[in-house]
């Protein structure tokens, strides 16, 4: 990353959630989850500016309460990527890159954001984080997207299926010992002109098959660079996730 590259980090946050309504406002160690995420992002030196993108009065009020910056967005966005683009447009200030940080990962580490920022150069269109898979449960879990990369670190394909298939090893228990598999971590960096383009694309066949929005970009010919992190990411999707992580950290 060039030292003069400017980056705005946008944290999309919705109150409505099928599995965990209101989760941005849940308390974790004395702070709301959205403040936990905001504080972690703000402490990353490479980030020029941080803001929350939300369609909810309660989340907006909470961000203003702890002194954060917030942009109101429309409620009907199909993805965090679309919400980020609207927020960036309303910011009305140019940046070299936008990083989309998930609003339900209160334990995101600044080092992970630094790792992603570290591969950003003017010729990068899109970028994301990946991590080596260490256990069989993750390897074969369809809720954990896997990724294949080429020799230049660009994503070839993302899938909920375990990829690649090791034909020479019929016993899948041998797979981790014989190949390095990577999982995708859903933090994205976009060049602004590319973000404007990908939000105009229609859903693609592969995206609909796998339910992974990044496949739309690959199918349309965009390049997604990857950065490898060694840090595990813990997202909170359900009340059970919250109980597990707070119990572990206490």
Swiss-Prot record:
GO terms for molecular function: 3-deoxy-manno-octulosonate cytidylyltransferase activity. InterPro entries: Cytidylyl_trans, KdsB, Nucleotide-diphossugar_trans. Transmembrane segments: none annotated. It catalyses: 3-deoxy-alpha-D-manno-oct-2-ulosonate + CTP = CMP-3-deoxy-beta-D-manno-octulosonate + diphosphate. GO terms for cellular component: cytosol. Keywords: Cytoplasm, Lipopolysaccharide biosynthesis, Nucleotidyltransferase, Transferase. The keyword Cytoplasm applies. Pathway: Nucleotide-sugar biosynthesis; CMP-3-deoxy-D-manno-octulosonate biosynthesis; CMP-3-deoxy-D-manno-octulosonate from 3-deoxy-D-manno-octulosonate and CTP: step 1/1; Bacterial outer membrane biogenesis; lipopolysaccharide biosynthesis. It holds the Pfam family CTP_transf_3. It comes from the Bacteria. Gene3D superfamilies: Spore Coat Polysaccharide Biosynthesis Protein SpsA, Chain A. Its EC number is 2.7.7.38. One of its GO terms (biological process) is CMP-keto-3-deoxy-D-manno-octulosonic acid biosynthetic process. It is found in: Cytoplasm. Activates KDO (a required 8-carbon sugar) for incorporation into bacterial lipopolysaccharide in Gram-negative bacteria. Belongs to the KdsB family. This is 3-deoxy-manno-octulosonate cytidylyltransferase.
């Amino acid at each position: 990353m060039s030292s003069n590259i400017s980056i705005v980090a946008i944290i999309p946050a919705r109150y409505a959630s099928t599995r965990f309504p209101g989760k941005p406002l849940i308390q974790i160690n004395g702070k709301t989850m959205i403040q936990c995420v905001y504080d972690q992002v703000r402490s990353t030196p490479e980030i020029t500016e941080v803001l929350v993108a939300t369609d909810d009065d309660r989340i907006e009020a909470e961000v203003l309460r702890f002194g954060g910056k917030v942009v109101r967005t429309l409620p009907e966005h199909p993805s965090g990527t679309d919400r980020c683009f609207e927020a960036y447009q309303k910011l009305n200030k140019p940046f070299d890159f936008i990083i989309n940080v998930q609003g339900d990962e209160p334990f995101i580490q600044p080092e992970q954001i630094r790792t992603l920022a570290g591969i950003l150069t003017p010729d990068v269109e899109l970028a994301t984080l990946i991590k080596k898979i260490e256990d069989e449960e993750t390897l074969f879990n369809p809720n954990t997207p896997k990724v294949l990369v080429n020799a230049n670190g660009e994503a070839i394909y993302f899938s909920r299926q375990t990829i690649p298939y090791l034909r020479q090893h019929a016993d899948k228990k041998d797979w981790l010992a014989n190949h390095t598999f990577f999982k995708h971590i859903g933090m994205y960096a976009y060049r602004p002109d590319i973000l404007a383009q990908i939000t105009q694309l229609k859903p693609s066949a592969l995206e609909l098959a796998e339910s992974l929005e990044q496949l739309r970009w690959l199918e349309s010919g965009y390049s997604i660079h990857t950065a490898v992190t060694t840090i595990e990411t813990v997202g909170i999707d359900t009340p059970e996730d919250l109980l597990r992580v707070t119990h572990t950290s206490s």
